[in-house]
């Protein structure tokens, strides 16, 4: 039985964002596939349980390495859309994915792993800029290969950064403010990022465009976030400020991967990079405008979730820079 919807393959399906992507694809009615690394004897039990859950939802699972070119080509010929949610250490491995997509010749849309800042229009401190540069390499390689694409700029993930900034699971009354706390950022709930991505990946309007997820209710500063959390909990938080100069110094002096974390905090919450450019009609699509009937979770609504049962996000992983 055919649904008329594109067959979607997720790379990195068992990772943090990949899990959301698989479930969004299923819920939106797409035949859904996952390409995952072969299981080992010491594979994590949680991964095994997740794969069983995927299978129970009807997900078709392929096992293989990204280095297995012929296997990738064969798998890609079975689907219409490839969405990568590979982690930072694997970004450049997507060059192998691009080569396989090019040879397969049937993929209608490729969404490379980004889901952060708009890499072509922001600059960052060196440690974070290196991450952005790798994403740019994948964009250029995708374009050069002539593969239909949608690049997704998700800005910041709500569950991840609310946990990092407000510590709702620990019920902490102390928070750290980076810089003045006034710079605006965009926080989007992971479920919404996945839903918008799946919608755009099978939408002709989003072909060869940048999807920027920037809903108006999710544009907040650190001080806005603290104020909203105080109203939600009825408590008063004690704020400690770290200056821009201190953050820059930390990004230059502390060990990996904390130096990348410092660079990211500077870029988002001090430089305000996510609000530093205007969207263009011929290049960009704003997700909440493209899909006005989709009810996204606002930051304030997410904080109410945290009051009852705060999610536990997974910390991001980064590749050790070569020397």
Curated annotation (Swiss-Prot):
One of its GO terms (molecular function) is oxidoreductase activity. Transmembrane segments: none annotated. It catalyses: (E)-isoeugenol + acetate + NADP(+) = (E)-coniferyl acetate + NADPH. It comes from the Eukaryota. NADP(+) binds at residues 14-17, 36-47, 88-90, 113-115, 135, 155-157. Keywords: NADP, Nucleotide-binding, Oxidoreductase, Phenylpropanoid metabolism. The record marks 264 as: Required for activity. The keyword NADP applies. Inhibited by zinc and copper ions. Repressed by 4-bromo-cinnamyl acetate. It is an enzyme of class 1 (oxidoreductase). The keyword Zinc does not apply. Disulfide bonds: none annotated. InterPro entries: NAD(P)-bd_dom_sf (IPR036291), NmrA-like (IPR008030), NmrA-type/Isoflavone_red_sf (IPR050608), PCBER-like (IPR045312). Induction: Up-regulated by EOBII. Triggered by EOBI in flowers via the regulation of its promoter. Circadian-regulation with peak levels occurring at the end of the light period in flowers; this expression is monitored by LHY binding and repression to cis-regulatory evening elements in its promoter. Involved in the biosynthesis of the floral volatile isoeugenol. Catalyzes the synthesis of the phenylpropene isoeugenol from coniferyl acetate. Phenylpropenes are the primary constituents of various essential plant oils. They are produced as antimicrobial and antianimal compounds, or as floral attractants of pollinators. Isoeugenol is a characteristic aromatic constituent of spices and a floral volatile compound. Belongs to the NmrA-type oxidoreductase family. This is Isoeugenol synthase 1. The gene is IGS1.
């Amino acid at each position: 039985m055919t649904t008329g919807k594109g067959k979607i393959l997720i790379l990195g399906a068992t990772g943090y964002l990949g899990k959301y992507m698989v479930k969004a694809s299923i819920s939106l009615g797409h035949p859904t596939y996952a390409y995952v690394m072969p299981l080992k004897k010491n594979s994590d039990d949680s991964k095994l349980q997740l794969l069983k859950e995927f299978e129970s939802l009807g997900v078709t699972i392929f096992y293989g390495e990204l280095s297995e070119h012929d296997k990738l080509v064969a798998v890609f010929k079975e689907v219409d859309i490839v969405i990568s949610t590979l982690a930072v250490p694997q970004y450049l491995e997507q060059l192998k994915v691009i080569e396989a997509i090019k040879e397969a010749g049937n993929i209608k849309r490729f969404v490379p792993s980004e889901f952060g800042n708009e890499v072509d229009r922001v600059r960052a401190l060196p440690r974070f800029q290196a991450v952005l540069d790798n994403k740019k390499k994948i964009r250029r390689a995708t374009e050069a290969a002539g593969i239909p694409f949608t690049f997704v700029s998700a800005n910041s993930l709500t569950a991840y950064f609310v946990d990092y900034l407000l510590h709702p699971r620990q019920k902490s009354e102390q928070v750290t403010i980076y810089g003045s706390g006034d710079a605006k950022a965009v926080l989007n709930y992971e479920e919404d990022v996945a839903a918008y991505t799946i919608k755009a990946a099978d939408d002709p309007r989003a072909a060869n465009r940048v999807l920027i997820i920037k809903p108006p209710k999710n544009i907040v500063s650190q001080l806005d976030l603290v104020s909203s959390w105080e109203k939600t909990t009825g408590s008063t938080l004690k704020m400690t400020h770290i200056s821009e100069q201190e953050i820059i110094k930390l990004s230059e002096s502390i060990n990996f991967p904390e130096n990348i974390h410092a660079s990211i905090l500077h870029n988002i919450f001090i430089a305000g990079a996510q609000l530093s450019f205007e969207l263009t009609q011929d290049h960009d699509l704003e997700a909440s405008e493209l899909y006005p009937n989709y009810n996204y979770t606002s930051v304030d609504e997410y904080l109410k979730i945290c009051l009852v049962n705060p999610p536990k996000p997974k910390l991001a992983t980064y590749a050790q820079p070569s020397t």
